[in-house]
Amino acid sequence: MSSQNNNKQGGQDINNKKDSDDIKPSVSKEDLINSLKNDELNKNTTMDQNDMKKNENMNIKKNEVLNNSNNVEDGDNENSKFMNKSKEGLNNINGEKNDDNNSIVKVEESPKSIGYNYYASESIENLCKEFGLESINTGLNSEQVKINRDKYGENFIEKDEVVPVWLIFLSQYCSPVVLLLLVAAVASLALNEVVEGVAIISIVTLNACLATYMEKSSGDAIGKLAEMASPQCTVLRNGQKVVIPSREVVVGDVVLINTGDSISADLRLFDVIELKTNESLLTGESEDIKKTIVADNLSTPFATNLCFATTSVTSGSGKGIVISTGLDTQVGKIASQLKKSSKGSKLTPLQVALNKLGGLIGLIAIIVLVVIISLAVIIKYRDPAHADKDPTFVIIIIGVGFAVSSIPEGLPMVVTITLSAGAKDMVKKNANVRKLPAVETLGCCSVICSDKTGTLTEGKMTAINAVTICKNSSLSDENNKLTKTFDFYPTKGFEPCGGLFDSNELTSEKKKEIVIAKNQNTSYDKVLYNYGNPSNKSVIVDKTRSLMFAAYLNSYDTTLSRDPKTLKWGIHGNMSEGPIVVAAAKVGYSFINNPNHKSYLDNFQRLDDLEVTFNSSRKMKITFYKLKTVNVFENVYLDKPGKVYTHVALIKGAPDRLLDRSTHLLEETSMKKVQVSWNSTITQEERNVLIKKNLELSQKALRVLSICIKPLTDQNIEELKKLEDADERLKYVNYDENGGFIPMGYVASFDPPRPGVKEAIQTCREAQVKVIMITGDQKPTAVAIGKLIGLIEEKSEQVEDINSLAIECSELHINKNPNEPILPNDQLDEFTDKILIYSRAQPEDKITIVQSLKRKGYLVAMTGDGVNDAPALKAADIGVAMGINGTEVAKGASEMILIDDNFCTVVSAIDVGRTIFSNIQKFVCFLLGTNIGEIIYLSVAIVAQMPFPLEALQILFLNLMTDGCPAVALSREPPNDDNMKTPPRPKKQPIMTKRWWFYGILPHTIFEALCVLLSLAFSLYICTGFYNLNGIHNLCKTVNLVDVNDANVYHEYKYFCSSYEYRISTDYVGWVTNVSFWDPQNNEAVNFWGAAKGKVENINPLSDIVHPELRLRMQDGCSGDLTLDENGWCRPKDNKTSDGYNDELEGILKKGFEDVTAKGSKRGRTMAFISAVWCEMLRAYTVRSWEPFYKVFNRNMWMHLACSISATLTFLSTCIPGITSILNTTCLLWWQYLLAIFWALLNLFLDEIVPKVIYRRKYMTIKN
């Protein structure tokens, strides 16, 4: 609704109480003076105080006041209610008397009192003085232009600074999780672990690139506002007409505007010639606004004698004084609000939760790093796989590995991929997400504030009923003899095929038959008498067709046409007149049904210059036509003794307004013709019947328009031509010697709810998401729509029940006055906590409602389409702009755009948002559970003096490659059955709740650690014969050699190792002993696998149980500087010295040589690595639901693919040369792979039978 409705007052009951919206467009002298006197009203909430120049002791001329009050019709002084002022003492203000002459009334109060727009009410003469404008005919001089520019500023809206791409990219590295990963990467590179460091940096950089792209693609709302400004403007300067850039326009400039111009600044008009502007960008009102010199309504910020920056001139021309520029204009104030709401970070609940999680992970990483390194130093931990490396270096590498294991490297990437995939899902549901985190934010939305027209409804008004009004009618409604209700049918959007039938006769069966007749292109009369068929001759048809003809002629500038490509019917022109044009076509008034229609219409000459256009103050439109036949309009006879009616005024508008101005009725004569009942005027009883009928229709959610006629003589027309002002013509038509209006009937239209809206609202109710409807409609219509879509229960019939759920937005203001300040927060919050329907709403009311709801702790989604909706969209947690009817500014201020403008899309998006968060919980639980499990089994391995189950690079591989795919698959999980049957999560709820920690993460970490450690111990045992470091270290023999430079320094070298291995092959199953020794024949260190069957301690190379080939190699003993030890193995002699390097030293296992214990340990650890991978891979299956995993096993085929990829990558990492050396893995035998997987299956079994069973019993309802 237009902001011109700002004068709406108080609450409105459903009974016949006249809206205070009925304030007439003029203001009485008494009210204006009283408003100036009233100190309590010396504020202006509609326009900024800063926009009003304070001017005490201002003189107001009585004749100016009287000019304004001349337009007040009799009985229309309801502005007194608006001001709530007594009319006493008008001639004695501040002790100064006012006579009937043009004397001056001195008023000490500032004229900028609340309820009156200063720039609309102030005289042009005083505005000129205020701005230094000497003459409106010459404009400003150059010196005054400079003064005004310095004083009021330049005329531009400053765009937000464009954030460069590189800065957006760098900002992606500021999250705690990403910073931790960067620290781990730097540490890895510093320790020469290049592969690990590069891998981490690559993953983080890829994630930053994705996030940068999404953020950069979002629009700039303030920039869009600035782009709307006209590039140039025509002004008067120094007596000359010049064209200047709009930015150079200053306050006080005289601006000339013409058809097609975009207005550069806010103007006060002083000269207009049929000037109309379109202000829909600001007000949301699609109607062109006819501009006047004298304002229709002084209380609205969008008075008709003002023009506004960024609006366009649709017809006519005019001149005006610039009253505001730049950020002081109406559109500038919107830009200021946008800037204000943009200040500071607007983190979504997910971003907050991820930051908290990152902080927790960082704390864990630091603690783990310090504790593990300290513990490893204390116990002098030495990894057998790196026995030849510096122990301190190994310990630091281990610490970094632990820190890496505590950080879920894949988390940022998976979150980004999840949100991106969710955004794509929403596009499929007609929701375009502009800001990626908003995808998930919808999941915790607890309130949806929705527009009605086009969002909850289809936005396609369709005429449903025609009601004729006629005395002595041969066919009338059952409950009265004055009206008769007819139904248009079928009613399918703008399709003009259909007829007009008696409502009492149009049963469900008849409707089906009519549809069949329509499809077969046969006459409806064969089914039911069509009162809209021109071929049917009856007095009732005369009445219905005359009613629709009058309505059609009044809507002359709206046309109906069919797209030749899509074959869809559409309306061109005023959409609010569309239903009338379509309905008229159904009774034969269209080019479609009547080829000669144009020539027929040409018989009715329209008098364009006399038209009274519709605005929100008049609530009516009047067109004037010359009659084809005097005293006859269509089938209505206007004869009156002594009068010759040559013209007719056709009036269409609000029923209450038109009924107030009606004096006579039509009647049906005994001769079965329709004529005006001039002999009697409308009685109160007859008025009550018409009022009741209007109310009956409006309570069915129908928009009711009254159609009236007023016959005029040639003399009337001549007198009307002398009146330049439309309101004067309205007054004349209403109160001339011919009487007032003659009502012909009502046309009731219905904007049907969108399919699925009622079900969507019920879904929201089940999901405990509050739905609020905000509309410009009157309260009864809004309530009726609310009932129709299920927003209010049908049983809510009592006024007190409805008032507890629906209010007019004026009630949000002090004294129920929309021009006074908003109620205090505590009182306001009481309203917004329970109200579901806000009627008579203005765009500025939306931001008030949003702010109140946010104070109450709700997470608010707000829909909007206009420029003036942008601040509310920005203030809401989730701004939702309309894709079809939305302005670019609204889209730029929003997080999401509804491609189809459909409310159901918002609900679908909430469903997707909840699913996304649920899936984020699942993969965060999955990643944290596996990572903490890694910390536990790595820590226990150190304490238990066992080799590490995994190395640092294996951990990174596990976290990124094998965990990454299942985590992404978890993000594609379908919603749970109760997804939209649970309340929205609180905004401050962490990602991982206590339940997730106690039943999801901690049990799994314990079970995974247990299974991996069991796998490590068992694997080491079957590969080396021992499971701990001491046992493995004792398998090797060493020699201590004196340093060549210092006799007190010794260097320790291994010269022999043995280990045990359990084999399963076709020819042997059992233990074997493997040895590493110095081969004297080849003069090198070698490994001999299967040196002897069984576990042989202190093995001798010449023993009979030793493999013959080994005996052959050692049969000649050692030579040179080597000697045999007690078991017959070569070693350096005791007198041998060393410089600490063993590259040239014989008889030892040189640096870099991988002996049987190292190889056995690697094999055992590879098996543990396989177990860890499969533990985490199978965990992805168990974390999907609290139900047993087999029940949801096949609901997400992506999971099977992801786990197949992870399993394949893991297998390849143990078999492909090069990769195995990087990851320090080795290829296993088939049964060793199976044994490793067995421990993972044990982990799955424990996850299923312990925590999930307990959780289901405690929290889940058992379904019968």
Curated annotation (Swiss-Prot):
Membrane-spanning residues: 165-185, 186-206, 359-379, 393-413, 923-943, 1006-1026, 1203-1223, 1226-1246
Keyword ATP-binding annotated: yes
Molecular functions per Gene Ontology: ATP binding; ATP hydrolysis activity; P-type potassium transmembrane transporter activity; P-type sodium transporter activity
This protein's record includes keyword ATP-binding: yes
GO cellular component: plasma membrane
Its membrane topology: Multi-pass membrane protein
Activity regulation description: Inhibited by cipargamin and other spiroindolone compounds. Inhibited by 4-cyano-3-methylisoquinoline derivatives MB14 and MB10 but not RK18. Inhibited by (+)-SJ733, a dihydroisoquinolone compound.
Effect on the protein upon substituting D1247Y: Decreases sensitivity to spiroindolone compounds
Region of interest (Disordered), residue spans: 1-102
Gene3D superfamilies (UniProt xref): Calcium-transporting ATPase, cytoplasmic domain N (3.40.1110.10), Calcium-transporting ATPase, cytoplasmic transduction domain A (2.70.150.10), Calcium-transporting ATPase, transmembrane domain (1.20.1110.10), HAD superfamily/HAD-like (3.40.50.1000)
NCBIfam families from the UniProt entry: ATPase_P-type (TIGR01494)
Something else known: ATP4 inhibitors cause swelling and partial lysis of infected erythrocytes, probably due to the osmotic swelling of the intracellular parasites because of Na(+) accumulation in the parasite cells.
Protein name per its UniProtKB record: P-type sodium-transporting ATPase4
Organism of this sequence: Plasmodium falciparum (isolate 3D7)
Name of encoding gene: ATP4
